[in-house]
Amino acid sequence: MEAYIRQKRASPGMVQASDLQINRPMSGMRSNSRELHAYDGPMQFISSPQNPDQILTNGSPGGINSVAMNTSRNHSNNMRSLSTINQEADLIEEISSHELEDEESSPVTVIEQQQQSASHSANSTQSQKPRARQHSFSDNLDEDDYTNRNVAGAAPVRPAGMASSPYKDATLDGSSNGTGNGTGGESEGDVIGNIDQFVMQPAPQGVLYKCRITRDRKGMDRGLFPIYYLHLERDYGKKIFLLGGRKRKKSKTSNYIVSCDPTDLSRNADGFCGKLRSNVFGTSFTVFDNGNKESTESPRLDLAVIIYDTNILGFKGPRNMTVILPGMTEDDQRVKISSADPKQQGILDLWKMKNMDNIVELHNKTPVWNDETQSYVLNFHGRVTQASVKNFQLVHDSDPEYIVMQFGRTSEDVFTMDYRYPLCAMQAFAIALSSFDGKIACE
């Protein structure tokens, strides 16, 4: 009996397909016409060859293999679908978070020198292709173009009759003493007094300020409108917050608000220091302080103008930029220039009129073409480590060895910014912000 029961349980026909009643309780008549197929759910497939819940016996190994193959195939398809979805999600995230470089520009890359000099670091930056200068439309870039430029109208940092410019006997990397750490005859700067006053004060001569800019792109709107934070680097990895900047959302042109209060980046904030405004094409930027253009007591002053050369022919190569600053007085203070004052001209108007008496003209340092690497090379002495078209060094034509400011990438959202006399933190930070902004018809 036990053997019979085990055999009965092992048979596949134990589960019936319907409520079939062979004999009616009240009648001895057989009536197969009273079969009730009342299942309209999954059980309707029990009698079907395509039954997904079919119980297979050990006597049909072919069926087991078929089911196993189908299960494996479905699992493989599901895994491929999940892999495709994950790849698409990663691609979308990468595109949204990836920095949009200027399409017309070649990125600046870092090379390793084969033979390192004891007085220089091995970190240099390079851009990939030579290109013609747009203003000359020549076939080959003249490396001495900036050096041989007519600079008769370019004013020195100090007015005429003063001592020679502080550009002599100093380089931004401190290579004069072979250390490359910025201690070549000058000291690293520190915050003196209140932050809001310090960021507007020109750097003293012989003092180098090493800073770091961090870009915050987290959040709903910060992918398109990131927030930038400027910190002064100190020893042992310490840093001091100086400025924060963000791009205004509702503005016809690019307009950045700069504040020394990281919690309130608005024009009405107590820490509002100034703003950066561009033209429609993004080729010209003007830096203003926190003054009121309608006020006569404290009018809004022009702090700087940044001009990027237009790329008419579409040649690729390093960016070309011109920075115009107010001149310096005998006591190392900026000349007050206000484009809001109808009685005087602004910095941009003075530069267009070639009136260089009270303004200073700077240019990005021309990279040197390297035949071995087939690229332009600039030496940042370890302060810049990654490729970007935003990497640059600002110099004066009268002394190309004195680097007024340098800026470059060290990681995806971290950049170094070093500046010295005659710039202040507000001017240098605004110049760096202009490099982040997208540009139409610019190289």
Swiss-Prot record:
Membrane topology term: Peripheral membrane protein
Principal subcellular localisation of the protein: cytoplasm
A GO BP entry: protein localization to cilium
Gly residues bias: start-end ranges: 177-186
Protein's UniProt keywords contain Cytoplasm: yes
Positions of modified residues (Phosphoserine): 136
One Pfam family matching this protein: Tub
Protein name: Protein king tubby
